């Protein structure tokens, strides 16, 4: 059986590889976030276009079946690679050869037309299998080691050879699908071929995140500020807390992390609560813990403003979700947020790690409700014109078609063997 490379107008058999970010995972954990959503929504939108999609993710529990139908046209395949239990993603590199071997074995019997790997370690495993079988490979990084190392420095727990592997994957794949302009600049600095890079942003479901509908409860006579995301320091919750003394009439809702029943035991929540007590704003901050995705639209609609103050953000889906709900956004001018949030039309962009600038931007919108409402309407229009999953899937499919039409114009060496601590 061979892929249908000679049928460019036919529906495609697509393999999405997402080694640590299962589309079936609950969101809010340290390693569960935007990539999980992206892979799930992209797969569904590609299936809506008539394609068959298989998603490959690592088996992290012994009782998981080999395959799980996610919806019509989409199946999640669990790959045995390393122990069948949750592992931090920074510990998964030694298990990528086994992951790649599994892919090669399965694809030899049923080869996809195109492979699209998500995250760099997925790229390592996918490159191993794709090159062995002559399959076309697209790569989306979602985050780059150069950026993480620059910002986290000694706190970066990535494997020491991550950047070298990211470069090797970028050199070996047929197309890099970047998510924003900042990422393209980073890839150029890594020396990767700009002619093989296509920008396709992440998306949002504008039929789910809508301006009208039920809203979550909110405090009386106070502005509601909402911050949503994984509870890790780089997401900037500490900056929002530090800004709150300058916003005496606002309440801050921080959404994310462990389930609500466990939130008070979370080390990051404890750290942030200590900062809130020191700042004298503990009575105006609520930590909800992780909430089900279906609750998010009502919560975002209830907010006066949504805050996205990350130190760095490879893309950032929360601004899109807020804008789709018609809620203005105050975000840091980093990564994909520089593309999605248009200052002053859909919200405000501020420097990272600057509580005073964040507070000033928030106060400016809270004190100008007509301007804030106009930002919300403009944000909704921007989502509809640029970021619906139908548009994202069409652009992604176009990148796949380009790869298939071009074939392998450049012969590349086989992917080297991966080993613990090995340099590519």
Regions found by a protein language model. Give the residues of each.
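Conserved acidic donor-binding segment of nucleotide-sugar-dependent glycosyltransferases
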Residues: 343-344, 348-355, 364-369
């Amino acid at each position: 059986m061979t892929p249908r490379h000679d049928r460019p107008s036919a529906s495609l058999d697509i393999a999405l590889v997402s080694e640590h970010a299962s589309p079936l995972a609950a969101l809010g954990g340290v390693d569960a976030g935007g990539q999980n959503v992206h892979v799930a929504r992209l797969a569904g939108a590609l299936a809506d276009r008539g394609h068959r999609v298989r998603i490959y993710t690592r088996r992290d529990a012994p009782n998981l079946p080999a395959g799980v139908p996610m919806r019509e046209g989409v199946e999640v395949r669990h790959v045995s690679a390393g122990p069948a239990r949750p592992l931090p993603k920074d510990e998964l590199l030694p298990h990528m050869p086994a992951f790649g071997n599994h892919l090669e074995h399965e694809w030899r019997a049923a080869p996809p037309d195109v492979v699209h790997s998500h995250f760099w370690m997925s790229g390592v495993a996918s490159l191993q299998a794709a090159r062995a079988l002559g399959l076309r490979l697209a790569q989306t990084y979602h985050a780059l080691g150069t950026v993480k190392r620059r910002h986290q420095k000694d706190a970066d727990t990535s494997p020491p050879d991550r950047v070298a592997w990211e470069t090797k994957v970028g050199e070996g794949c047929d197309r890099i699908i970047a998510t924003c302009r900042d990422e393209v600049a980073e890839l150029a600095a890594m020396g990767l071929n700009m002619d093989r890079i296509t920008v396709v942003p992440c998306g949002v479901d504008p039929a789910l995140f809508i301006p009208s509908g039920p809203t979550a409860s909110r405090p009386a006579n106070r502005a509601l500020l909402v911050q949503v995301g994984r509870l890790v320091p780089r997401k900037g919750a500490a900056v929002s807390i530090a800004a709150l003394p300058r916003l005496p009439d606002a309440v801050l809702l921080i959404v994310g992390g462990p389930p609500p029943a466990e939130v008070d035991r979370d080390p990051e929540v404890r750290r942030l609560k200590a900062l809130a007590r020191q700042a004298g704003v503990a009575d105006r901050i609520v930590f909800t813990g992780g909430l089900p995705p279906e609750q998010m639209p009502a919560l975002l609609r209830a907010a006066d403003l949504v805050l996205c103050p990350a130190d760095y953000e490879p893309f950032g889906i929360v601004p899109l979700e807020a804008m789709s709900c018609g809620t203005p956004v105050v975000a840091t001018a980093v990564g994909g947020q520089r593309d999605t949030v248009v200052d002053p039309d859909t919200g405000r962009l501020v420097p990272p790690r600057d509580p005073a600038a964040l507070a000033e931007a928030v106060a400016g919108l809270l004190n100008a409700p007509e301007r804030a409402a106009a930002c919300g309407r403009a944000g909704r229009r921007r989502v509809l014109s640029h970021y619906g999953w139908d548009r994202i899937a069409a652009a992604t499919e176009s990148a796949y078609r380009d790869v298939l039409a071009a074939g392998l114009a450049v012969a590349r060496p086989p992917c080297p063997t991966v080993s613990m601590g090995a340099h590519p």
